[in-house]
Amino acid sequence: MVRVRLAPSPTGTLHIGTARTAVFNWLYARRQQGSFLLRIEDTDKERSKPEYTQNILEGLRWLGIDWDEEPLIQSEQVQQHRAAIETLLQKGLAYRCYANEAELDAMREAQKASNQAPRYDNRHRNLTPEQEAAFQSEGREAVIRFRIDDNAEIRWNDMVRGAMSWRGADLGGDMVVARRAPADQIGDPLYNLVVVVDDAAMAISHVIRGEDHIANTAKQLLLYEALDLPAPTFAHAPLILNAEGRKLSKRDGVTSINDFRTMGYTAEAIANYMTLLGWSVPEGMEERFTLPEAAAVFSFDRVNKAGARFDWDKLNWLNGQVLHALPAQQLLDDLRPLWAEQGWTLPDDSSWGLELCELLGPSLTLLKEGVEQATPFFKCPDLEDDGVRQLEADGARTAVAQLLQILEAEPWDGKDTDRAKQLLADAAKGAGVKKGVVMKSLRAALLGRLQGPDLITTWCLLARIGEDLPRLQRCLA
């Protein structure tokens, strides 16, 4: 049975790279009718925080990604991690290294001076008991290193990249698997070791992650073999790149799912776009889809090896498509809290908010634009330059005065669009101007500018809350 996992570290909010990894794992699990699991890798005691764990879980739920078992907390598995290290020590596959930081720094400087690649030189791999005792008598603490044979050939078949091969000599020397501690203890176990132990304990069948983990995969495969554990199948997805082709980072600005939410992107658009960052849709499939729709056809045959460039225009287009297709009630539910933050309340007329959303929805690219575009419907706007020019144009004041005269003589409630059109025609005839003059002047009076949504619907909505006459009257003041 397929079992995959997402293993975020709660040292920050949910990152776009982690979100894309989550999407690929979830899609593969659902496609294969397998299980998608979570493991919270909280072993960085100083930087891990419960609020980050909560943020990650909430972010995944927001994206529509659910998991099938209770999340495993890595810090709660430390006894199993230490037991695995003890096994390696007993087998002679790991050893204590007493080299201190000053000695290691000197080693690196010497390598740099001779243009050698930085690596541990395995200097304490074969210490005699007497040498170990001498270091211990100095009070030295020790890290624990896993032996890596320079002649080892590590091979695996990657679901994205095909046949992969690494030489042991390219892995930087014997690998630290536990932090420095007194010689009679095992220090805090480190990433590559604990990942192997946890993945085996969770019966993970496929490890799906970014290509920046390829070197880790080579190291971990050696650990699987050393611990007599079954190795999973690996898939290394392409990195997400910025516009210049470099790995997307915090320096590029928005990288947190929180930021995307704040900017007004929808969960559906973000999840959709995360899928497209490295995966090509099958022929005949639209690029706009839901996660369940993608899961029905997802495979790693269509995941690219090359890095995926983040394209803001593409994301904006997708988000606009999602917003344009939202039912009015759902858009209203999404916008209501944003409007409430502005101190705006909807009128008692329950259909008014829905009709406003039907009016604004087709023009939205970001959800937050629903605040800016709704502003004239909740408070009287200032006149902008183009609005002022229109109201100062020939015939404009006459047209506004004529329309006001008709409305004061024949009040209407804004519920009849045909009546609105007739009122405009009557005002144009009475003022002796073209109907376009009346319409432009009405738009300037109501919205303060000449650009905006459908005029008749706008007028009807404002008339229903008694906002049309005061705005017309101010233009004649």
UniProtKB/Swiss-Prot annotation:
EC number, UniProt record: 6.1.1.17
Chief location of this protein within or outside the cell: cytoplasm
CDD domains per the UniProt record, alphabetical: GluRS_core (cd00808)
Intervals of motif 'KMSKS' region: 247-251
The keyword Magnesium appears for this protein: no
Single GO cellular component term: cytosol
Source organism superkingdom: Bacteria
UniProt motif ('HIGH' region) ranges: 8-18
Pfam families for this protein: Anticodon_2, tRNA-synt_1c
Catalytic activity: tRNA(Glu) + L-glutamate + ATP = L-glutamyl-tRNA(Glu) + AMP + diphosphate
GO biological process: glutamyl-tRNA aminoacylation
Function, as annotated: Catalyzes the attachment of glutamate to tRNA(Glu) in a two-step reaction: glutamate is first activated by ATP to form Glu-AMP and then transferred to the acceptor end of tRNA(Glu).
Family statement drawn from the similarity comment of this UniProt entry: Belongs to the class-I aminoacyl-tRNA synthetase family. Glutamate--tRNA ligase type 1 subfamily.
Official protein name in the record: Glutamate--tRNA ligase
Top-level taxonomy: Bacteria, Bacillati, Cyanobacteriota, Cyanophyceae, Synechococcales
Gene name tied to this protein: gltX
